Amino acid sequence: MEIKDIKAVYFVGAGGIGMSAIARYFLSKKLVVAGYDKTPSNLTHELEKEGMLIHYEENVDLIPEACKDAKTTLVVYTPAIPAEHKELVFFHENGFTIEKRAQVLGTLTRTHKGLCVAGTHGKTSTSTMCAHIMHQSHIDCNAFLGGISKNYGTNYILSDKSDYVVIEADEFDRSFHWLRPWMSVITATDPDHLDIYGTKEAYLESFRHYTELIQPGGALIIHKGLEMKQHVQAGVKIYEYSQDEGDFHAENIKIENGGITFDFISPIENVTGVELGQPVPINITNGVAAMAMAQLNGCTADELRNGMKTYGGVDRRFDFKIKNNKLVFLSDYAHHPKEIYQSAKSIRELYKDRKITAIFQPHLYTRTRDFYKDFANSLSLLDEVILCDIYPAREQPIPGVTSKLIYDNLKPGVEKSMIHKEDVLDLVKNRDFDVLVILGAGDLDNYVPQITKILEEK
């Protein structure tokens, strides 16, 4: 189905962060946009205010009539939805065009210049940073992001003049194989989603295949030292980047007085005096990648500086809620051992002499089973670790796989305890903290507004 032929779009799994960005795209085109989600959330409520029709019961009768014409309705679904879902079965049985979110994005990369960011971690911050730099420049861009940009209050950026689209390329379920990037950053290839891939080798092969999809004339910007083989088409340039070395890197890094500045070293043009609007050490590396992609597509030195200085961050990515001399409280989406390591390392660099406590909710039974020792090692960088029950998301429990696997492997000297998420608010009321961070991609984040309020009132 061509995008020009679509009159209505129905989403099965409307409230996911990636799905909602596409929903907003079709809302901007003045189409009928509706969908199902399992539970209401802040995001679904926002979509409803913007004009989307959403229901929360798995019921074919609740699908709007405007979305029941197979000739003019596109159905978009998330892989997290089971194949036996009643509404999905209805659409299959009645000949509807049914596409994954990634297929829709793939179509857009064929009609626009796709600037894609892939990788096990760092892709949301890097893609959002790149989108902000591009959007405030003379070039502009559209963007489909994996988090809510604090600069724009949304995960979707619309431009009616730019041919560029910035996309977070998701490796889950091999979704990024639908894309045809003009350029792509690859931030990291630490194995993940082994419930899908089975082996580390299959995971790395998936990224290798992804590099084949970059269009001739474009470029691959890959983090230096990754354990993968790229296989680009003729005419695709390859650049390496990292914090300290590569074609693109940072020099003269200064972390002082709560701020971070550095010089951006580039084969095109060096940019001195770059200031991070969100001064977190990991954003030096993310910033180098984002600036590289933006510079390769025509952003000037002043636009790069201004974009980095005014970048406000992403919800749940090093998201500071309270920041003063007495107390620091932040929320971070880190849910892979390497992400947690980088978050913990950044927090430790910022607050060298303060006690750092993490409340961590592991995400997925399979990920916990596969990486519990790595989780324990990363969390052991902190002074105190409070573990919640595993957030299952799409999975069923696995016998013997609980948060205690991580608990038992934390290094000696780390204060540790286990807690049910329902008891977190009482814990916060009855404890004093120096630096407190909520870690994980589950639903513990729903408590963050209440935790913030409790801490502010103390």
Regions found by a protein language model. Name each.
Residues 1-100, 104, 219, 249, ...:
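N-terminal leader/targeting and accessory segments in enzymes
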Residues 2-8, 18, 25-29, 256-258, ...:
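Nucleotide phosphate-binding/pyrophosphate-handling subdomain across enzymes
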Residues 25-31, 48, 62-67, 79-222, ...:
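Phosphate-binding loop of NTP-binding sites
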Residues 31-38, 220-224, 357-360, 382-392:
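Short internal beta-strands
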Residues 36-37, 55-60, 99-106, 144-146, ...:
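Beta-strand->loop->alpha-helix junctions that form or flank phosphate-binding loops
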Residues 50, 237, 376-434:
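C-terminal helical cap/extension that packs against the catalytic core
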Residues 68-74, 162-163, 432-434:
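Short acidic/histidine-rich motifs immediately flanking catalytic phosphotransfer sites
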